[in-house]
Every structure is written in C-alpha cells, then in structure tokens.
Amino acid sequence: MSEIKDVIVQGLWKNNSALVQLLGLCPLLAVTSTATNALGLGLATTLVLTLTNLTISTLRHWTPAEIRIPIYVMIIASVVSAVQMLINAYAFGLYQSLGIFIPLIVTNCIVVGRAEAFAAKKGPALSALDGFSIGMGATCAMFVLGSLREIIGNGTLFDGADALLGSWAKVLRLEIFHTDSPFLLAMLPPSAFIGLGLMLAGKYLIDERMKKRRAEAAAERALPNGETGNV
C-alpha cells in the first residue's frame, strides 16, 4: 500500500509533470485558453499514458534494450492514433479545437519519460497506476490554468463543454461575470506563461509551508514530556 500511495502522491503533487518536471509545456501553454480544451487534452494524455505504460510494462521482458526507444515510440504512436480517432468520432468539436496537439502527444516528453523511467522496470498494474497519476497531475495543472484564463478573459467557465461531453453539457456553462469586451491578454500565450509562473510560485510556497509544519511537529515530538520548547 505504501508503494501505491507513493506512486499516486508523486504523480499528482511531488513529481508533477507540469509544475515540477516542467515537461510538455508546449501543449500546456497553447491549449489552456479554456477549461474545456485543457480538460480534453489532459484526459487524452492521461489515457495515452495509462495504456502505453501498461503495454510497455507487459512487454518489457521481450523488448531488446538496444532498440527499446523506437519500440516505445511505435507503441505510443499506435495508442495516440487510436485516441485521436476516438476523439474525432465522439467529440469532433474538441478534435477541431485541439488540432495538431493531439498527434503531438507522441513526442511529449512525459509519455516517453515515464515509459523509460518507470514502465520498463515495474509491473503492469503499478505502471498503469503511475501513468494515470502522472496524467491526472498534468490534467489538474492544465485545468486550473485553463479555468483561470477563461474566467479572467471571458468571465465564463466550461464554455463549449458540449464539444467534450455532448449536447447535455451546455448546462455546465457558468457565467462568472458579464463582459462585453473579453480581456484578450488572458486568452493569448503570454498569459499562459504568467499563469504558469504564478502556479509554480504557489506550489513552492505550499511545499515550504508543509515542510515547516513537518519540522515543527518533529521538533515537538522530540521534546521530553512536559516541555514545550518555549524559553
């Protein structure tokens, strides 16, 4: 259980691919103009990560070390092609919106990196969990950034959700505030850099505060009974 918990925590927070490793920044910065686009690409990447980790881990004993990278890329490309066709068939609006960034998942350093660093060394179940955790960590970062940019830029949240979830999802659209002229800077790439920088700073502050609390708790436990540590 401790290993499973560690894989989940590493993927979602401690080793977050977007906020710690800073991998996959091209789609992270380009697609997060709305929450729907961010969520769509994040879920697609999560599905690819999970399936490729599972497949590569299952075949790891039969994969020659000398040609493992080309084999990994072929597996990743096959899974991405299948996911691309699924999105094209069932979420065509999202497919048009994401465009080239769906097939570019093949070259995403996150996918190849987890295949080499984790799936090639661990069992299928744990590798699939690692892929899912890493993917969800990236999805959460993309969703937060996309939501902030959409709210600041358009005053809405989940605008165009029907492109991802179907016509019923139109009810998910929220108008946070009304604006006649959208704040274009929030929808352009510079705001993605600014937003990502603020998220990195926020994670750093949270980590430092948690580290300080753990140190204080450890110091209190180390004191003899009856002492408070106050002079």
Curated annotation (Swiss-Prot):
Which EC number(s) does the record attach to this protein? Answer: 7.-.-.-
Which keywords appear in this protein's UniProt record, sorted alphabetically?
Answer: Cell inner membrane, Cell membrane, Electron transport, Membrane, Translocase, Transmembrane, Transmembrane helix, Transport
A cellular-component GO term for this protein: plasma membrane
Question: What are the transmembrane regions?
Answer: 18-38, 39-59, 63-83, 86-106, 125-145, 182-202
Q: Which InterPro entries does the record associate with it?
A: NqrDE/RnfAE, RnfE
Q: Where does this one sit in the cell?
A: Cell inner membrane
Q: Which cysteines are cross-linked by disulfides?
A: none
Q: Which GO terms describe its biological process?
A: electron transport chain
What protein family does this chain belong to? Belongs to the NqrDE/RnfAE family.
Q: How does it assemble?
A: The complex is composed of six subunits: RsxA, RsxB, RsxC, RsxD, RsxE and RsxG.
- Protein name as catalogued: Ion-translocating oxidoreductase complex subunit E
